[in-house]
Amino acid sequence: MESCITVIGERDVVLGFRLLGIQHTIIAEGKDLLKKFLEVFQNPQCNIIIVSENVKNMMDKRTLRSVEISSKPLVVFIPLPGVREEETIEEMAKRILGIDIGNV
């Protein structure tokens, strides 16, 4: 069974990742963004989902919590241009892996 990395988001974001060689990409905006994200999130072959941070605002609290604690697939939100990232790499590692890399 092949595992995959999938990128979901606005056209500019997705095209950038295609240039980096990621084959599984989905261009989606608006309501379609959440729909496509949930389809990929439920796919057992997908290991990593890189998605536009816009999708966070569309999720209900239960779905967002499920996504935040998921390690397979691991979901990485792409910050919106001009918006400061909320979660640092150290915080993400602690949340997902349960380890504190800030004091290493």
Curated annotation (Swiss-Prot):
Residue pairs linked by disulfide bridges in the UniProt entry: none
Membrane association type: Peripheral membrane protein
BP-aspect Gene Ontology terms: proton motive force-driven plasma membrane ATP synthesis
GO cellular component terms listed in the entry, alphabetical order: plasma membrane
Localization in the cell: Cell membrane
Keywords of the record: ATP synthesis, Cell membrane, Hydrogen ion transport, Ion transport, Membrane, Transport
Keyword Heme found: no
Quaternary structure and partners: Has multiple subunits with at least A(3), B(3), C, D, E, F, H, I and proteolipid K(x).
Protein name from the UniProt record: A-type ATP synthase subunit F
Lineage, top ranks: Archaea, Methanobacteriati, Thermoplasmatota, Thermoplasmata, Thermoplasmatales
